[in-house]
């Protein structure tokens, strides 16, 4: 796979992986997303996404947000340090255009780079 792919090894899948990030992660937030990141293994950046039904009511809206997050992560994964990242969508994300979601995520990726590079 190419450098901009999103293989299974780049995903957080297990509840214990999510719990570790929730307990130890550096937090970055804005109107659309809460992003938690903590130092991961040597395998590069890994992503977990949570979009609660309470935050985004329709399944189509939740899917759109998850696709936007995955696409942004996929394009920026090579720049990110070896971190485990969890992105939580807020209800405001459902009302935003995809371009606004991308801009928000780009800002969060910069925050992750700043906060996790030296730790």
Predicted segments with their positions:
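Positively charged, solvent-exposed patches that mediate nucleic-acid binding
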Residues: 1-119
């Amino acid at each position: 796979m190419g450098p901009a792919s999103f293989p299974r090894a780049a995903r957080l899948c297990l509840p214990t992986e999510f719990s570790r990030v929730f307990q130890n992660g550096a937090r970055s937030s804005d109107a659309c997303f809460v992003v938690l990141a903590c130092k991961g293994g040597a395998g590069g950046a890994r992503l977990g996404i949570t979009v609660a039904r309470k935050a985004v009511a329709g399944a189509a809206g939740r899917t759109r947000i998850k696709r936007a997050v995955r696409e942004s992560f996929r394009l920026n994964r090579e720049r990110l340090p070896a971190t485990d990242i969890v992105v939580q969508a807020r209800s405001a994300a459902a009302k935003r255009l995809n371009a606004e979601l991308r801009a928000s995520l780009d800002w969060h990726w910069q925050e992750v780079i700043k906060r996790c590079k030296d730790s």
